Design a protein with these regions (language model features):
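Conserved acyl-donor/pantetheine-binding loop and adjacent beta-alpha core of acyl/acetyltransferases
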Residues: 62, 66, 79-122, 129, ...
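Conserved N-terminal entry element of GNAT/NAT acetyltransferase domains
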Residues: 1-46, 50, 204-208
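Conserved acetyl-CoA-binding loop-helix of GNAT-fold acetyltransferases
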Residues: 119-124, 130-146
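Short, basic/aromatic recognition patches
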Residues: 54-64, 69
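C-terminal "cap" of GNAT-fold acetyltransferases
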Residues: 166-178, 184-208
């Protein structure tokens, strides 16, 4: 499927909002519109109101203009059909979703200079799922992260994939097909997930 992928910028704010108000939650109720505001580099240790779609929309506008939500939009025939939230892991440890659900995930690195990009969401329009859009978005994230000097890409797929709404980080098989390996399993009161990683730089012993 021939799509165009654009890195999210404030210029694309209108497209982003439209996607979340139409295709992203077409299978769900209006109350489910998240705008991906809980996965970002904002500091949610400061009390933040996520209580309604309208308040989450206001936060999305602020966060995108401030560069706190990062990721990529996929376009087909001029319309947004997919979204991947991808951000610097170390900068997102105080967002509300990490603080509430992800504290069992290992955040240590082999070196203080190691840079990891995390994939927090992969959302595809209902009529265009299973057509390779998610894989193309994921590959773009990997390519750009490598060019930006990141060492790893990391993601957190559920062990039991239910559906795109509840398992919004994508299935494990998607990541395995694209060079990721499991580096941790997390099972606690909130999660039953894999932590998967893909190296973006040659490691010692790798063949050039």
């Amino acid at each position: 499927m021939d799509i165009e992928i654009k890195k999210l910028t404030p210029d694309l704010l209108k497209d982003y909002l439209h996607f979340f108000e139409t295709e992203a939650h077409a299978d769900n109720s209006d109350e489910d519109r998240c705008y991906c505001v809980c996965w970002c580099s904002a500091d949610h240790r400061i009390k933040t109101d996520f209580s309604s779609p309208e308040k989450r929309r206001e936060l999305a506008v602020q966060y995108i203009n401030d560069g706190l939500i990062q990721g990529y939009l996929a376009y087909y025939e001029g319309e947004v059909i997919g979204w991947c939230n991808a951000n610097t892991k170390s900068e997102c440890l105080n967002c509300t979703s990490w603080l509430r659900f992800m504290t069992s995930v290992d955040t240590t690195e082999t070196s203080p200079d190691t840079k990891t990009k995390s994939v927090y969401c992969l959302t595809i329009a209902p009529g265009l799922k299973r057509k390779g859009v998610a894989a193309q978005l994921l590959n773009r994230v990997c390519d750009d992260a490598a060019a930006d000097g990141f060492d790893y890409i990391e993601a957190y797929p559920s062990k039991q994939f239910v559906d795109e709404f509840r398992s919004f980080m994508g299935p494990l098989e998607l990541y395995k097909r694209n060079g990721f390996t499991v580096c941790q399993e997390v099972k606690d009161k909130y999660n039953d997930i894999y932590v998967v990683r893909k190296p973006l730089k040659l490691q010692a012993g790798d063949i050039k």
